[in-house]
Each structure stands twice: as structure tokens, then as C-alpha cells.
Curated annotation (Swiss-Prot):
It holds the Pfam family OMPdecase. Catalyzes the decarboxylation of orotidine 5'-monophosphate (OMP) to uridine 5'-monophosphate (UMP). Coiled coil: none annotated. This is Orotidine 5'-phosphate decarboxylase. It catalyses: orotidine 5'-phosphate + H(+) = UMP + CO2. GO terms for molecular function: orotidine-5'-phosphate decarboxylase activity. Its EC number is 4.1.1.23. GO terms for biological process: 'de novo' pyrimidine nucleobase biosynthetic process; 'de novo' UMP biosynthetic process. Substrate binds at residues 19, 41, 69-78, 124, 185, 194, 214-215. GO terms for cellular component: cytosol. It comes from Stenotrophomonas maltophilia (strain R551-3). Belongs to the OMP decarboxylase family. Type 1 subfamily.
Length: 241
């Protein structure tokens, strides 16, 4: 059975994508952002450095929440073994693929901590033509909602999905299911590789629990000021819903 969304403070609903190649740069960003960011996503680029779990420990020591975004996908027994080990670390969110019901059920059963598992639905860099190339000739929203319902039935705690699909997911799954939205663009589309993007206020109005933002903060002239501006927008959006 899916567990209720994490009891997040408003400032923990902004997750910064720590997309850097090594520990030194990761911790430099944590210092630069200070208390403007309380939640960090660490992914595949950092894993390749061999310093992934050192960074995870450092974040936990600084009282930051951690989102492990490694999109685990394997046979059920192997994926479950990974989740069992990962649940021993101070992790708030972790991603698995949302394509395999038996694997999702095994992962849900193996999670022995407060970590919430999020199923990856359709990457925000993909549109309908990309799905068609994979043999799925359907609109992304239909695939996302179908996978969200399958994840919920398997006992997974939520999904990671475009803010464009947050409303349909919330309508289909109800209030007790976590929705985390990447590809958020506070100032609108910026012409990068993200195709299905929305703004901060829209994501929360449609039911998102948290958002993931990387480049709009990282590439800002003043990253801490950019993060604080997003925090203010989140607070306003939450107050309005």
C-alpha cells in the first residue's frame, strides 16, 4: 500500500538538482545556496565520480533532505535488494522505473524505512514522437496516468512526472499519493532539452507535492537569490490552493 506523502516544510518542496561531476563541486553548491535550499537531488553524473555516498552523508550531516535519482530497473529480486540496502541510508526519495509491476511490488515490500519510492513515468524530455519511436503511439499524459495507477496499485508511494500531468495524476490517484515534478521553468521555456515544462505556481496548483529545479538556479547570475524567489513563489502557490 502506498504511504502518505512526506510531511514536508514549505522550504523542502523545492528540490535542487545537484547535477555536478564530483564531491567538491557538489559541496560548493551546498555552501553557495546555504539555507535557500533544504532538499537536494543527486543523480547519475555524481554516481560516476565514486563519491556518491560521501555526498549523501555530507548532505545528511547538514540536515538536508536527499533524493536519490538513479531510476533503478532490474529483475524484481535485484531491484528489491538495492532498495533494501538503500533504505538503510538517510534518503527521503528514490526513483525506480514505472514499467514493471512485479518489480515495483518487490521494491515496495523491500523498503523498510521512511524513504518514499517514486516511479518514473515518462521523462520530461520526451514528447509523443519520442514515445512513438518506442512503439507507444499515445499521448504522454495517458501513459503517465496509466503508470501512476500501476505504481499506486503496486504499493509505490508516488511518481515523478511532468507538471503538465500533475492534475490528471492527482485526479486519478487521490490526495495520498506523492507527485514530484521535474522540468520546472520559473521563467517559462528556455529552449533546452526539456519538452513538457510548466511554471512553479501551475505545478502546485495542479497538485504537485514538490518540484525539482536545476538549471534555472544553477545558471542564474545569483543562484541563491533565484532559489529564494522560487521559495516565495512556492509559498504563495501553497497558500492559494
Amino acid at each position: 500500500m502506498s504511504r502518505a506523502p512526506l510531511p514536508l516544510r514549505d522550504d523542502e518542496r523545492l528540490i535542487f538538482a545537484l547535477d555536478v561531476p564530483d564531491r567538491v563541486q557538489a559541496l560548493d553548491w551546498v555552501e553557495r545556496l546555504g539555507d535557500s535550499v533544504a532538499f537536494y537531488k543527486i543523480g547519475m553524473e555524481l554516481l560516476a565520480s565514486g563519491e556518491y555516498f560521501q555526498v549523501l552523508d555530507e548532505l545528511a550531516r547538514r540536515d538536508k533532505r536527499v533524493f536519490v535519482d538513479l531510476k533503478f530497473f532490474d529483475i524484481p529480486a535485484t531491484a528489491a535488494a538495492v532498495i533494501k540496502r538503500l533504505s538503510q541510508w538517510p534518503v527521503s526519495y528514490a526513483t525506480i522505473h514505472g514499467w514493471h509491476p512485479a518489480m515495483m511490488e518487490a521494491c515496495a515490500a523491500a523498503n523498510s524505512s521512511d524513504m518514499r519510492l517514486l516511479a518514473v513515468t515518462v521523462l520530461t524530455s520526451m514528447g509523443r514522437p519520442d514515445l512513438a519511436q518506442m512503439g507507444i503511439d499515445r499521448e504522454p499524459v495517458d501513459v503517465v496516468v496509466e503508470r501512476a495507477l500501476a505504481a499506486q496499485a503496486a504499493g509505490i508511494d508516488g511518481v515523478i512526472a511532468s507538471g503538465q500531468e500533475a492534475g490528471p495524476i492527482r485526479a486519478a490517484t487521490g490526495a495520498g499519493f506523492s507527485i514530484v515534478c521535474p522540468g520546472i521553468r520559473p521563467g517559462g521555456p528556455v529552449g533546452d532539452d526539456q519538452k513538457r515544462t510548466v511554471g512553479v505556481a501551475q505545478a502546485f496548483a495542479d497538485g504537485a507535492d514538490a518540484i525539482v529545479i536545476g538549471r534555472p538556479i544553477r545558471l542564474a547570475a545569483d543562484p541563491q537569490a533565484a532559489a529564494r524567489a522560487i521559495q516565495q513563489e512556492i509559498a504563495s502557490a501553497l497558500a492559494a490552493r
